[in-house]
């Protein structure tokens, strides 16, 4: 096994163990921003994961959600970590939340691990080697007709700048898609695209740690990931659309129809 993947799995699995240790405890829940929660489980899980990464790779850079580092990449090796993606779900005992660990090298994704805690599903990818779910190769779906497409999205609770055109888009998609879901954890949504459960995904107000791992998993599963302008510059832009090639193209077309261009541009 690729050494970086081996350590990423070790760190992510240790993070899952830390999360599970909090399930029988009373959580300390705080707001770090408008409608943006953090729990003591997030902090402890991040500490667990970063401890392993720093021990194994002391010279690597780290970008992690709860350390609030500036969202940038160096030309070297950077680990991008979300200790609990879906903190609000976790805080309310809604059983969809993930640990996400990614390695980017020279500003490109190289290794990705996402573990959905309650289902114990391990999604992994190494650049150029495909994507797997619990060790089995996965691929995006082959759906091409919108009326047969099953799509995921999100409704950012701390950014209402797009809510009006976003809901108009949502209403239109309700009429032409087979179904839309909002599980509340972008990493899980994206991984479900990678394994063919969902055919596409779109959302805004996402950060690098929300998409760094799962987007590589989608690409290695044969899918497409772009920003809302159809460009490859999506890691820090806070706008993402993904899917198999056909459904990605359809969602991108609808985004262009319903969201003004200035609101589709990356957020710097």
Each language-model region and where it sits:
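N-terminal subdomain of lithium-sensitive/metallo-dependent phosphomonoesterases centered on the IMPase/IPPase/PAP
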Residues: 1-84, 232, 246, 250-253, ...
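Oxyanion/phosphate-interacting regions
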Residues: 1-10, 168-175, 188-268
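Residue-level signal for inorganic ion chemistry
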Residues: 19, 42, 53, 87, ...
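Generic detector of well-ordered alpha-helical packing
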Residues: 43, 47, 66, 83-86, ...
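Residue-level detector of anion-binding/catalytic polar loops
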Residues: 59-61, 137, 179, 199, ...
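Glycine-rich active-site/cofactor-binding loop and its immediate structural neighborhood
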Residues: 77-119
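Acidic beta-strand-loop-alpha-helix segment within the catalytic core
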Residues: 102-190, 237-268
């Amino acid at each position: 096994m690729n050494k970086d993947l081996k350590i990423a799995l070790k760190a992510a699995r240790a993070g899952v163990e830390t999360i599970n240790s909090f399930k029988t405890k009373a959580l300390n829940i705080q707001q770090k921003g408008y409608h943006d929660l953090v729990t003591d489980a997030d902090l402890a899980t991040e500490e667990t994961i970063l401890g392993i990464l720093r021990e194994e790779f002391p010279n690597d850079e780290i970008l992690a959600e709860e350390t609030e580092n500036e969202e940038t990449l160096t030309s070297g090796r950077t680990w991008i970590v979300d200790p609990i993606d879906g903190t609000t779900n976790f805080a309310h005992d809604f059983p969809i939340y993930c640990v996400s660990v990614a390695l980017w090298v020279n500003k490109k994704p190289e290794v990705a691990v996402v573990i959905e805690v309650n289902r114990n599903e391990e999604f992994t990818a190494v650049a150029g080697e495909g994507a797997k779910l619990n060790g089995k190769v996965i691929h995006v779906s082959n759906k091409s007709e919108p009326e047969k497409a099953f799509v995921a999205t999100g409704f950012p609770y701390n950014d209402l700048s797009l809510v009006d055109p976003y809901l108009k888009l949502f209403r239109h998609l309700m009429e032409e898609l087979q179904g839309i879901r909002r599980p509340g954890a972008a990493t899980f949504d994206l991984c479900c695209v990678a394994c063919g459960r969902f055919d596409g995904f779109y959302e805004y107000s996402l950060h690098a740690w929300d998409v760094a791992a799962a987007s590589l998993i989608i690409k290695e599963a044969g899918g497409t990931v772009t920003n809302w302008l159809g460009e490859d510059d999506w890691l820090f832009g806070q706008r993402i659309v993904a899917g198999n090639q056909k459904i990605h193209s359809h969602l991108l077309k609808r985004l262009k129809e319903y969201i003004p261009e200035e609101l589709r541009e990356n957020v710097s």
